[in-house]
């Protein structure tokens, strides 16, 4: 489960995107403050909902540098989060910045 009272931001390279129902997910490699690289699992909305919101399975690809915000896992040693937004700074393409872009 996630700490819905907290919000974190991670920046890194997308290594995998699973565009499916009931939940999509992305995996990113992101540097920690100590310089170590961590693999984060980020839960997202289902593919059918995301497609209605304008995304496709190729909207984000492995190798994309992304910034993701969301709620972290309640377990601090578990590198997972629930996505609130994702941004690709290279072209400012993102999701989660419009009020209709949510999976609740």
Model-inferred region functions:
Residues 9, 36-39, 94:
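Short, mixed charged/polar active-site loops
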Residues 35-47:
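Short, basic/aromatic beta-hairpin or loop at an interaction surface
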Residues 8-10, 66:
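Hydrophobic core residues within well-ordered beta-strands of beta-rich domains
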Residues 73-101:
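OB-fold/S1-family single-stranded nucleic acid-binding modules
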Residues 12-14:
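Conserved hydrophobic positions within beta-strands
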Residues 51-68:
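Short nucleic-acid-contacting surface segments enriched for D/E, G, S/T with interspersed K/R
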Residues 20-31:
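Short aromatic-glycine-enriched beta-strand elements
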Residues 1-8:
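Short boundary/loop segments of OB/S1/cold-shock single-stranded nucleic-acid-binding domains
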